[in-house]
Regions:
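Acyl-donor (CoA/ACP) binding surface of acyl/acetyltransferases
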Residues: 1-32, 65-182
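A short helix-loop-beta-strand connector motif used in the catalytic cores of GNAT acetyltransferases and
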Residues: 50-63
Length: 182
């Protein structure tokens, strides 16, 4: 599975990505909206879970690399997440702090959104984040998702849920003048 955008390649994880992913997930600034940064065991579980998801669902976290250099700068993809008690397909993204505020999250999230609605039968996509994660909900909104819910999680505190339906995505394709595969 490979997705290409103007500046990025999104591809399935391999075990060769461990060191770069560990550097990303263990960074306290990058992971400030998680309960804690990941250790080596958590990073191994991240890759293993991604590999399992590719087999089970046909999607998962995808490594994000710069098209020009091949440098790993984060990940973006779809995972099944428990959101306020429901198992839902979530678009998520994690970007190395050196690449924040350059539009990579938006670019990747839009590509993953378009891939999901053209290659799966999913009726909606979700994104959820802590209420203080402005970058995450800004990225979700830039990808066409709208805030649909707020709820209190016992471990993470207040969370926001953003979503886009297949119908809304089709309307967005028309309004953006894009040629989507309907």
């Amino acid at each position: 599975m490979v997705l290409e955008t103007e500046r990025l390649i999104l591809r399935e994880y391999t075990w060769q990505d461990f060191d770069a992913l560990y550097a990303l997930l263990s960074d306290p600034v990058t992971m400030q909206h998680y309960p804690k940064p990941y250790d080596e065991a958590g990073t191994k579980r991240w890759i293993d879970w991604s590999l399992q998801n590719y087999q089970k669902y046909g999607f998962g976290w995808w490594a994000m690399v710069l098209k020009e250099t091949g440098e790993f700068i984060g990940d973006c993809g779809i995972t099944m997440q428990r959101i306020d008690g429901q198992l839902l397909p979530e678009i998520g993204y994690h970007i190395d702090k050196a690449y924040w505020r350059q539009g990579y999250g938006k670019e990747a999230a839009k590509a993953v959104r378009d891939w999901a609605f053209t290659h799966t039968k999913l009726d909606a996509l979700y994104s959820y984040m802590t209420a203080g994660n402005v970058a995450s909900y800004s990225t979700a909104a830039a990808a066409g998702l709208k805030k649909v819910k707020e709820y209190e999680d016992p471990e993470d505190g207040p969370l926001y849920v953003y979503a886009i339906t297949r119908v809304e995505w089709k309307e967005l394709q028309v309004s953006e003048g894009e040629q989507g595969l309907f």
